[in-house]
């Protein structure tokens, strides 16, 4: 039988940095609420969570990487919302944010959870920020907790 290792969802004693976009704040504030709720319900204390507000989703990768290399956090959580409009701006921003966050995590070895919504409509974003489709901020926080614990075991 193979040995299977997976992270536990216990955040006690873990330190988290959260980078959250101010753009589309009516969505991002709900994502932040979900992430904070997940962290505290899983045992994290307020003193172990730092929130950093960035202008928009495009700025998330840089701040995430800076937080990761600071060695003050065991995981970083990125929260934002990119909603499609009438121009190709959506494609450029969502692609660069996704790549930038992934690269920051791979470059630093620090888990950086992706809680950035990329939706076609405002309604879809609202659904994913705490209504019909759950809260992706919560999901990103749970991913961060699990990854910290898993990496501790490796």
UniProtKB/Swiss-Prot annotation:
(2S)-2-hydroxy-3-oxobutyl phosphate binds at residues 86-87, 128. GO terms for molecular function: 6,7-dimethyl-8-ribityllumazine synthase activity. 5-amino-6-(D-ribitylamino)uracil binds at residues 23, 57-59, 81-83, 114. One of its GO terms (biological process) is riboflavin biosynthetic process. Transmembrane segments: none annotated. It is an enzyme of class 2 (transferase). Keywords: Riboflavin biosynthesis, Transferase. It comes from the Bacteria. GO terms for cellular component: cytosol; riboflavin synthase complex. The active site is at residue 89. Its EC number is 2.5.1.78. The keyword Metal-binding does not apply. Pathway: Cofactor biosynthesis; riboflavin biosynthesis; riboflavin from 2-hydroxy-3-oxobutyl phosphate and 5-amino-6-(D-ribitylamino)uracil: step 1/2. Catalyzes the formation of 6,7-dimethyl-8-ribityllumazine by condensation of 5-amino-6-(D-ribitylamino)uracil with 3,4-dihydroxy-2-butanone 4-phosphate. This is the penultimate step in the biosynthesis of riboflavin. Belongs to the DMRL synthase family. This is 6,7-dimethyl-8-ribityllumazine synthase. It comes from Syntrophus aciditrophicus (strain SB). The lineage of its organism: Bacteria, Pseudomonadati, Thermodesulfobacteriota, Syntrophia, Syntrophales.
């Amino acid at each position: 039988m193979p040995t299977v290792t997976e992270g536990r969802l216990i955040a006690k004693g873990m330190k988290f940095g959260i980078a959250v976009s101010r753009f589309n704040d009516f969505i991002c504030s709900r994502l932040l609420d979900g992430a904070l709720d997940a962290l505290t319900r899983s045992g994290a204390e307020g003193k172990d969570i730092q929130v950093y507000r960035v202008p928009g989703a495009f700025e998330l990768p840089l701040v995430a990487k800076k937080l990761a290399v600071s060695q003050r956090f065991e995981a970083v959580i990125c929260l934002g919302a990119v909603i499609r409009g009438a121009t190709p701006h959506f494609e450029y921003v969502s692609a660069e944010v996704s790549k930038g966050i992934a690269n920051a995590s791979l470059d630093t070895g620090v888990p950086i959870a992706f809680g950035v919504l990329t939706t076609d409509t405002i309604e879809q974003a609202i659904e994913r920020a705490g209504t019909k489709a759950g809260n992706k901020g919560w999901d990103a926080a749970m991913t961060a907790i699990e990854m910290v614990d898993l990496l501790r075991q490796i």
